[in-house]
Amino acid sequence: MNQSPSKNYFTMPNEIFSLGLDASEIAVYAYLRCLENRSTYQCWPSYTTIGNAVGRAKNTVMRYVDALAEKGLVSTEPTSVLMRSGIKKNGNLRYTIRPIREAIEIFHARQLSAVERAAERQ
């Protein structure tokens, strides 16, 4: 059994635990990290596939993906599939895992903005 060890595990940045994510957001992020192509940082799972992996409904996964995108952890873009009949259909989203540094900067900027707004109110 000569398997590449990099296919049996994935890494998670330690900073993920300091960004105020709830457990389900972390689970969705971890699943996307697990599936990502380590050269392109991209993957294409369906909402249903993600939901089955993390034990959440499709609509709930959609909300978590939106939250991860808003927090700068992932970006998404629609894809399309050309069927044999020639009909073009919507495909799964293409997820790109963003550098953790970007998410940390967004998190700190939002915290600073909240502190400034609170100071203005006083």
Residue ranges and their predicted role:
Residues 1-122:
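Electropositive, intrinsically flexible nucleic-acid-contacting patches
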